[in-house]
Regions:
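Conserved acidic segment of CheY-like receiver
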Residues: 1-12, 16-17, 51
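Conserved Asp/Asn-Gly motif in the active-site loop of CheY-like receiver
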Residues: 30-37
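Alpha-helical interaction/dimerization surfaces of two-component signaling modules
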Residues: 15, 19-23, 42
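CheY-like receiver
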Residues: 40-41, 45-92
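A generic structural motif
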Residues: 24-30, 46
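Short, aliphatic-rich N-terminal leader segments
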Residues: 9-10, 31, 44, 55
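Short helix-capping segments at alpha-helix termini
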Residues: 22-26, 72-74
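A structural micro-motif
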Residues: 1, 27-28, 76
Length: 92
């Protein structure tokens, strides 16, 4: 399986990548992008199975990115992450 990590914070991306033994849970390839626009490009080209995505990012947020990918990758598993505690925003 392929995992795409989309987050505008490089430290977050590298921390998530280095903290988990991805191959032990069936992830063969870990891809990354630094915002929603680049995430769209990588997802369209590589067709990941799972997207681990920040909610708030410049240019295109994670929710908008996943909405645009919905028709192209209908079986994708999205997982959102956020450093914000704004519960109303996260509920959306």
């Amino acid at each position: 399986m392929k995992l795409l990590i989309v987050d505008d914070e490089e430290l977050t991306r590298t921390g998530v990548i280095s903290s988990i033994d991805w191959t032990s849970i069936g992830i063969d390839e870990v891809l990354q992008a630094d915002d929603g626009i680049n995430g769209l490009e990588v997802a369209r080209a590589k067709k990941p199975d799972i997207i681990l995505c920040d909610v708030r990012m410049p240019r295109l947020d994670g929710i908008q990115m996943l909405e645009r990918l919905e028709g192209l990758l209908p079986d994708i598993v999205p997982v959102f992450m956020s450093g914000y505690s704004d519960k109303e925003y996260l509920k959306a």
